[in-house]
């Protein structure tokens, strides 16, 4: 009986091949959409947070005019592990605005793509996106405030995952705006920022800011860079769910209509099968198995397509943000859950459409 049921199953699949093929393509596209976007979501979240962690992204930044005593006052707070003063200033060279930032040991450390961290006052490290846009390479010289600086490193920074100049220029053109990191000896004025690491609340940070006379105090979660990261992460996750839902609805509709029509046309065959002792459950399995099998094949192909497309999509996203090492990562649990979900969807769609007819 089992062998004959399987022969009947594949005979019915051949008979409904066009409809099943259409359903399989929808499953494949829906799976590819979801797995691609959700993989990017998981990979982006993982790599970006690793960058923030490993490069010691500042938990709080104080803006104003400070000296070493102010840095010491911040360091003395019980919830602050480390604090560093630094200089930040924008310089305009022709059509290009360069933001020069002094290096801070242990806070907002640089991720090196190539080269060495600047040590002398006539050296600098250039953020990668700006270097690529202007064709800057190691050993080149660039003008900052009329001074020639030799490029010793191409870098990424945890505070510039997004190349944002300010709140009015969230996505600055990389050939018009760049960030360079310089040795502290480049500047001769008071610190303009204090960056600190620590498990500190916004209220406690604001209190410290008042003590040192900061013009503005911003915790990490409110930094423009982190706000953009969090917002994009949520949007990618939302899109990962919204687009596949369209295909899910189409799949349900196709399976429902196809199965209803098939049951109507095969009512006599169903009656004969029941007359010779075939249980209604076995007949139900027959219709559920063909859609689940096609859903399984479509989901497998969708996962393969996602693996092929993911790096290309990440490359497109990389025009908006820069996270070192961001690439396709295979998540077995994700693919497994998607495959099972589409198989269950196919089976349930059949169950809803035929349960009353096979009683």
Predicted regions, residues:
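Membrane transport/envelope proteins' first extracytoplasmic loop
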Residues: 2-252, 315, 320
